[in-house]
C-alpha cells in the first residue's frame, strides 16, 4: 500500500554509514517541486544542520529522464517541473550516535525522520508511506518503531505509514539485533527494545 508520497529507505553496505532514500511523489508541483529538511527536531528546538549529511541528490521523471535539482539554501531544493510522478534519490551519511540524528553501521541502524525524510513542500499535510528495507547482507535484524504498520509484520521490515509529515518525523526507527519485551504498567501497555 503505497501513498502518493512514498519513501524507500535502504542501504547496500551498512558499514558505509549511508542510507539510500528514494522519494516518489505522485503529483509534484507543476511549477517545480520544492523539498526541504527541517533544521530542528521535535522536542529539541535548537537549530541543527541535518541537511549537511545529504551527500548526493538527484531526480528523474516517470520516463527515467534526469530532472535538474538546485539548492535554494542549506536545507531546501527545487526540482524542475515534470509531467507525472517525480522520483528523488539521495544519500544520507549516518554516523552520529546521538538521539537527534542518524547512525548506521554493520551492527545497527537508527534514525529520526528529521535526518532522513525530505518534506514535499505544499504536501506536508498528506499521508505518506515508508518502505524500510533490510540492509543487504543482513539476515537477523528487526525493526523497532512506533510508525503504524501498513504491510510490515510486527518488528519487521516492510511498509509503514504516517498521516502527514509532522507525524512521520515524530517516530524514530531502530533496526538491528535487540531484545524486545511488552508489559503493562498502571493499565498502560508498554514495549521496550534493548
Language-model regions: role of each:
Residues 39-45:
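Short amphipathic, basic-aromatic surface patches that mediate peripheral association
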Residues 47-56, 60-194:
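Non-catalytic architectural context of zinc metalloproteases
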Residues 1-39:
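Early extracytoplasmic/domain-onset interaction patches
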Amino acid at each position: 500500500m503505497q501513498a502518493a508520497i512514498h519513501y524507500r529507505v535502504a542501504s547496500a553496505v551498512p558499514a558505509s554509514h549511508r542510507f539510500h532514500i528514494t522519494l516518489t511523489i505522485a503529483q509534484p508541483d507543476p511549477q517545480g517541486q520544492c523539498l526541504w529538511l527541517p533544521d530542528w527536531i521535535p522536542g529539541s528546538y535548537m537549530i541543527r544542520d541535518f541537511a549537511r549529511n545529504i551527500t548526493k541528490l538527484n531526480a528523474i521523471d516517470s520516463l527515467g529522464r534526469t530532472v535538474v535539482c538546485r539548492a535554494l539554501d542549506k536545507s531546501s531544493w527545487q526540482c524542475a517541473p515534470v509531467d507525472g510522478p517525480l522520483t528523488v534519490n539521495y544519500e544520507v551519511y549516518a554516523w552520529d550516535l546521538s538521539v537527534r540524528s542518524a547512525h548506521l553501521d554493520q551492527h545497527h541502524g537508527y534514525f529520526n525522520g528529521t535526518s532522513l525524510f525530505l518534506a514535499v513542500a505544499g504536501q506536508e499535510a498528506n499521508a505518506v508511506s515508508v518502505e524500510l528495507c533490510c540492509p543487504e547482507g543482513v539476515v537477523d535484524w528487526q525493526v523497532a518503531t512506533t510508525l503504524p504498520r501498513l504491510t510490515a509484520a510486527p518488528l519487521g521490515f516492510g511498509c509503514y505509514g504516517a498521516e502527514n509529515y509532522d507525524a512521520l518525523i515524530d517516530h524514530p526507527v531502530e533496526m538491528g539485533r535487540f531484545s524486545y519485551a511488552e508489559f503493562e504498567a498502571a493499565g498502560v501497555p508498554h514495549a521496550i527494545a534493548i
